[in-house]
């Protein structure tokens, strides 16, 4: 009997900077992920897709990213989440830690986001 092909890991990506959203979507799809990209929280909350990992910018036009993660998790499954931001302060770090949300700092260089996603979805190559 032939093996069934496994489905790609689904990433929900929310970033209001259009060029960064496009670049991240391209890079993650090139890595084999299925990406659902959004530029704001509201459209995502209206019809959230099934997701294996959330990657969300902190500063969005209609809601902060940590609040969005908490609202999405309250709707059902609680996938791992990664918050992307610039210069997170101690208060944000504590709040993210309490919510079991990883933080990756911008600029997104050196593959840190890719490593965090792979670790979050259990595909780390240690």
Named regions from a protein language model:
Residues 1-12, 18, 25, 42-46, ...:
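Non-catalytic signal-transmission and effector/linker regions of two-component phosphorelay proteins
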Residues 18-36:
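Two-component/phosphorelay signaling modules centered on CheY-like receiver
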Residues 37-53:
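Acidic, metal-coordinating helix/loop segments flanking the phosphotransfer/catalytic sites
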Residues 39-40, 64-67:
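Acidic catalytic/metal-coordinating carboxylates
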Residues 57:
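Active-site residues of response regulator receiver
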Residues 61:
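The feature encodes the CheY-like receiver
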Residues 88-105, 115:
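Alpha4 helix (beta4-alpha4-beta5 surface) of REC/receiver domains from two-component response regulators
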């Amino acid at each position: 009997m032939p093996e069934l092909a496994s489905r790609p890991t689904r990433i929900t990506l929310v970033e209001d900077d259009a060029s960064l959203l496009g670049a991240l979507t391209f890079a993650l799809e090139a890595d084999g992920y299925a990406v659902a990209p959004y530029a704001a929280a509201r459209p995502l909350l209206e019809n959230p897709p099934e997701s294996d990992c959330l990657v969300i910018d902190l500063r969005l036009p209609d809601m902060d990213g940590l609040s969005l993660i908490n609202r999405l998790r309250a709707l059902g499954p609680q996938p791992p989440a990664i918050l992307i931001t610039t210069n997170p302060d101690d208060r944000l770090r504590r709040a993210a830690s309490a919510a079991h949300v990883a933080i990756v700092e911008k600029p997104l260089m050196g593959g840190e986001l890719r490593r965090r996603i792979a670790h979050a979805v259990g595909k780390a190559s240690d």
